[in-house]
């Protein structure tokens, strides 16, 4: 019976778990505390070391020693280094200046050999190079095709890709304006048209009047009505004129002066002048015969009236001149 009692005591101790579990938990807590103690000691030791290092750096700064900087070290700027820098900069500036002077001289020489050299209007660098390229291309085309460098195609090749002022300068220097175009058209006309233009192209220069175009008779004829020219053409060539176009007139902007006072500055003339009369000039026959031989359209037997040249100009004709005109038209 005693043995069973002992067994019951042992079983009771085994069943009683909180006792031995408390012992195990207590041992684990002791181990953790032992492990955590050195960590706290290490943190404190590191803080004390940093504080000591900061104090040492402050002491070094107080002593005058600067801390070392990272990166490339800058050399001290001495007077010798400053002089070397200045001399190097002066040499670079002089080298760039001579280079630009040489480039400008070369461009000036290139402008002189271009077909549109002008002392007043200087082309820019890019325009000079473009014109030189077009000039070389146009000359090569002339050599290949054998055409003359005086046509319109040559100017078009020169002005390709250029600005409007440069194109105007090229056309002006080559003298290819509206007059040259008229000359090219004039070459294609028939000889009958040439003779017609030469007959009616009077060049009467009056002594006492200003320089052309006011002194020419062309300006007075051009302000006449188309019926007068029609009558002149029918009298010289018959009723049928050849198919030829006359060049457009580029006269002055100001109204022409009149010698005899037939053509006033007013646009609205008198009703008597609105009627169609045959044109009969009252200039002396000696002046016309000396200027041109062609005097067939004019009658030689008509009365002539000499008007003094040195009279003062008046926009409204006098009564005496009006009576002379009436007698001319009635006769």
From Swiss-Prot:
Give the domain of life. Eukaryota
Q: Where is the signal peptide?
A: none
Q: Which Pfam families match?
A: HLH (PF00010), Neuro_bHLH (PF12533)
User: Where are the annotated segments for Disordered?
Assistant: 1-80, 246-265
Subcellular location, in the record's words?
Answer: Nucleus
Where composition is biased (Basic residues), the residues are: 67-79
Which cysteines are cross-linked by disulfides?
Answer: none
Gene Ontology terms, cellular component aspect? chromatin; nucleus
User: Primary place of residence?
Assistant: nucleus
Domain bHLH residues, every copy: 87-139
Keywords per UniProt? Activator, Developmental protein, Differentiation, DNA-binding, Neurogenesis, Nucleus, Phosphoprotein, Transcription, Transcription regulation
GO MF, any single term? E-box binding
**GO biological process: one example:** amacrine cell differentiation
Acidic residues biased stretches: 52-64
Post-translational modification comment from the UniProt entry: Serine or threonine phosphorylation within the basic region may regulate neurogenic activity.
What interactions and quaternary structure are annotated? Efficient DNA binding requires dimerization with another bHLH protein.
For this protein, the record's PANTHER family field holds: BASIC HELIX-LOOP-HELIX PROTEIN NEUROGENIN-RELATED (PTHR19290), NEUROGENIC DIFFERENTIATION FACTOR 4 (PTHR19290:SF86)
What is known about what this protein does? Probably acts as a transcriptional activator. Mediates neuronal differentiation. Required for the regulation of amacrine cell fate specification in the retina.
Task: State the protein's name.
Answer: Neurogenic differentiation factor 4
Organism, as annotated: Homo sapiens (Human)
Question: What would be the name of the gene that encodes this protein?
Answer: NEUROD4
């Amino acid at each position: 019976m005693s043995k069973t009692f002992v067994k019951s005591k042992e079983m009771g101790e085994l069943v009683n778990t909180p006792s031995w579990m408390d012992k195990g938990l207590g041992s684990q807590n002791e181990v953790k505390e032992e492990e955590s103690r050195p960590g706290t000691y290490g943190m404190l030791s590191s803080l004390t070391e940093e504080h000591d290092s900061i104090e040492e750096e402050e002491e070094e700064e107080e002593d005058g020693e600067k801390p070392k900087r990272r990166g490339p070290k800058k050399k001290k700027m001495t007077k010798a280094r400053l002089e070397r820098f200045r001399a190097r900069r002066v040499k670079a500036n002089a080298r760039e200046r001579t280079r630009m002077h040489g480039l400008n001289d070369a461009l000036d020489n290139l402008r002189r050999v271009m077909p549109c050299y002008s002392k007043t209007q200087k082309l820019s660098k890019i325009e000079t190079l473009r014109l030189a390229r077009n000039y070389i291309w146009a000359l090569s085309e002339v050599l290949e095709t054998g055409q003359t460098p005086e046509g319109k195609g040559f100017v078009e090749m020169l002005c390709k890709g250029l600005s409007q002022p440069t194109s105007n300068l090229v056309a002006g220097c080559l003298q290819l304006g509206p007059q040259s175009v008229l000359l090219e058209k004039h070459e294609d006309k028939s000889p009958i048209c040439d003779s017609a233009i030469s007959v009616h192209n009077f060049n009467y220069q009056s002594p006492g009047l200003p320089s052309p175009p006011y002194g020419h008779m062309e300006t007075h004829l051009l302000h006449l009505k188309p019926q007068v020219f029609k009558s002149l053409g029918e009298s010289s060539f018959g009723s049928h004129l050849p198919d030829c176009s006359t060049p457009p007139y580029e006269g002055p902007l100001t109204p022409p002066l009149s010698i005899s006072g037939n053509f006033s500055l007013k646009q609205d003339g008198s009703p008597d002048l609105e009627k169609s009369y045959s044109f009969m000039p009252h200039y002396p026959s000696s002046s016309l015969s000396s200027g041109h031989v062609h005097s067939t359209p004019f009658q030689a037997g008509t009365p002539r009236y000499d008007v003094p040249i040195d009279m003062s100009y008046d926009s409204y004709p006098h009564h005496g001149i009006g009576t002379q005109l009436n007698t001319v038209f009635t006769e």
